[in-house]
Amino acid sequence: MSLATTLFAPWWRPQWVRQMLADLIAEELRRLRPGGPAPHFDLPSTVSNEAEPGADADLDVVLGLGSIELLDIATSVCVRFGLHRHGLDRRLLKERRLRVWAETVVEARRLDDSDLSFFSSGATGEPRRCVHPMSALVREGMHWAAQLADRRRVLRAVPCHHIYGFLFGVMLPARLGIPVLDVRAAPPPDVLARAEPGDLIVGHPGFFSVAAADADAALADAVWAVTSTGQCPDFVWGALTDLGLERMLEVYGTTECAGIGNRWAAADPFTLLPWWVVEPGRERLLRADADACVAADRWVWVDGRRFRVLGRLAGAVQVAGENVFPGRVRDVLVSHPAVADATVRPYGTGIALRLKAFVVPADPDADAAALRLELIPWLAERLRPAERPRRIDIGPALPQTPAGKPGDW
């Protein structure tokens, strides 16, 4: 991308960058302080190309960061936006204000806008850096802008530092020149009630399920929605249609690959986005400007460009729109001194899917109820909400099938 394009790329204006930084910092702080309160930045809830950047935030006052926490968060910002390539990383440690951090990111992007990094949980549950050519992200952003050119406003119910939120909550509205309203603090049914003609609601299946289940009034005319991060169940599509949603776009993609396919109806298969080429054997996808993308799910092909998603290939399961890894949760459980062994499995289906755990106490005479009460807050300090087992069963041995293999319970 040329320097001229970079200088005028609307998504790199400070008001957009501040929103991304606020979400990124909040996530990093949740990782560093499991179970702690979420930080609050006094930023405008509505952002547009014309908006003023908004109130500044003193990171020391808002977050009370220790030196190691500050270093961790600053490193994440540097790696994501490429500040370290131009010696701008040191500025984050000296000037601990959100305004300065945003201006530093903008300066870095003016110097080098060749790629952008996002982080995926990957196959092991540990954050993994995924680098995307900026040209590929711009191409995808322009594709969605053409599909959604008549939208007047975005209601954003997802964080904008993840790739889905960046594409639809930052790049799309900045490209179209329309405002974005952050609606994450509002109950999902209220978001539907507040939607106006021409709005695009950017959410995920869990959000839309709650919104549709508790909504008590029809939607305004000409409201659209986009959903991603996991397949949206048919009943959610149906409920939203009954409420008067005019159209819904479902995007299938991953942090590693960005958008892969899309569909406009629950009964339809996904159609590959135009730039993807299927490799022989159909196990990998290719595009000219990036490495091959290996599917994280099992697909069945309808024809040369359309496919259906059957489920996860790796050990990850989708809980509330997030990838979680039962093996990692099990590792945390068995690190508790009162736990001799454990197994963790998903239960439920679709958007109601959660984790359950079976625990073998280190002390055979341990009181099961007391151990359960001890584990719940202990796990809350070490696991994200989506990772925490909703059921904890306790017994003398792990469940087995008659053949001696690990069993369900």
Label each region the model flagged.
Residues 213-267:
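Gly/Ser/Thr-rich phosphate-binding loop
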Residues 61-94:
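Phosphopantetheinylated carrier protein domains
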Residues 115-142:
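Conserved AMP-binding A3 loop
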Residues 105-119, 149-153, 245:
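Conserved pre-ATP/AMP-binding loop-to-beta segment of ANL
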Residues 298-387:
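AMP-binding/adenylate-forming catalytic core of the ANL superfamily
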Residues 2-50, 73-76, 116, 150:
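Thiotemplate assembly-line natural product biosynthesis machinery
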